[in-house]
């Protein structure tokens, strides 16, 4: 083994840090230890752009050490801890690289991960026949196959030691999506939409708490 690419994660934006720590933090520690055994191995840690806390002026060189993360958002907090561990290992000579992903969508052929929050939101709106008219979200998507190819390319070029943002600045507004389907969907206020989806949460993949956190 020459290279370890650590993309395994438990992605749950509603779970607290302690719930996600065994999978997202302890596993990272174990893989970093693996990279020091017998011979040094390159370690590529797949993180999230959200560790920057939406800082507008942040870039790959931004020091995230002082950025606070609420333990209630366990996913982002666990990725922040993972980055700190990866940087610490780099300090001790392990060739590490950090890849921060934005919102990764389907591949170019349309296959998508059904548990992703955006897919759940769109599915829920379609299932209910209603969308939220007084709240909107700007979304920037990257294709999963393009993202994977970029990571593989960086890993094979032996560019250890860097931090890379694998995301796009091109955004679209969710309201633009809904406008194309207004004849089939009813516009509701956030309160009305949440009340209706709560009644249907068994068939809308338990998205209520996630969307509440996202839009409120």
What are these regions (language model features)?
Residues 25-31, 78-86, 121:
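Conserved catalytic Lys-bearing alpha helix of Rossmann-like short-chain dehydrogenase/reductases
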Residues 14-20, 54-58, 110:
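Conserved catalytic-core motifs of eukaryotic protein kinase domains, centered on the activation segment
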């Amino acid at each position: 083994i020459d290279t370890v690419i650590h993309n395994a994660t438990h992605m749950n934006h509603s779970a607290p840090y302690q719930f996600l720590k065994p999978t997202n933090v302890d596993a990272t520690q174990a893989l970093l230890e693996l990279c020091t055994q017998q011979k040094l191995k390159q370690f590529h840690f797949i993180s999230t752009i959200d560790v920057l806390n939406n800082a507008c002026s942040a870039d790959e060189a931004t020091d995230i050490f002082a950025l606070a993360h609420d333990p209630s958002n366990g996913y982002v907090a666990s990725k922040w801890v993972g980055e700190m561990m990866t940087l610490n290992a780099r300090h001790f000579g392990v060739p590490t690289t950090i890849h921060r992903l934005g919102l990764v969508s389907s591949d170019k052929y349309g296959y998508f991960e059904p548990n992703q929050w955006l897919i759940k939101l769109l599915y829920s709106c379609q299932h209910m026949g209603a969308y939220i008219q007084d709240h909107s979200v700007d979304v920037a998507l990257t294709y999963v196959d393009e993202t994977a190819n970029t990571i593989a390319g960086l890993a094979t070029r032996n560019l250890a030691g860097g931090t890379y943002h694998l995301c796009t600045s091109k955004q679209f507004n969710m309201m633009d999506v809904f406008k194309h389907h207004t004849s089939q969907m009813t516009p509701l206020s956030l309160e009305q939409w949440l009340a209706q989806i709560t009644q249907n949460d068994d068939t809308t993949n338990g998205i209520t708490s996630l969307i509440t956190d996202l839009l409120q």
